């Protein structure tokens, strides 16, 4: 075979290898990403939009403006929704049904020193991407029954919010989001996952599953089980092979799993990876 032909053949093999779907622990393949999102240097929470098909919601971590970003699955920012509130340590965003239809819940629950007397959860009607803003948020001041905790993960089912602490126990706390102008709601401990440092949790778009992530795995639970305190997962996906700079967010829509990461020194843009997974029914 001529040298030129060998070079062409080798180049074609290399290109095919580079463009191949990347397998993640068997059940998942990367179908897009990592996409680089310059406005999300500290992408923290992630949620699948219920009102805008094909879009995700995310936000930056502490020290940033109170803005929700609508992204498509390639990482392009399609909308920016500012909220008229002050941020302390935003850690998560969740999408769920509410009395007015579909709502977004922002969890200002970060507490690295476990010293905050109260944390805050904000609820707003989920806007259409064409809307420049949404209604003023409802504010839920909250405490834990056993004192302050650092947490980065929250999911919402009906009128109840569930917070998972960022410690070895990964304890789950539950409270009903009842507005009150004069007193805080109290989160009660209902169980623990024992996963270590949980950075995000979210219900699937159809509401049947809850996905919880750490730096090295995404763990799936049946929603009906988890809200009753049954903490046995039905599926686990290893994700540490993706080499995210600092993996943070997770969202699930059918068989699509989405992961977000903060940027790294020298390239501050956040990352978004989309995976297609073969999940048990």
Task: Locate each region found by the language model.
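N-terminal Sec-pathway targeting helices
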Residues: 1-7
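Sequence/structural signature of beta-propeller domains
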Residues: 3, 13-281
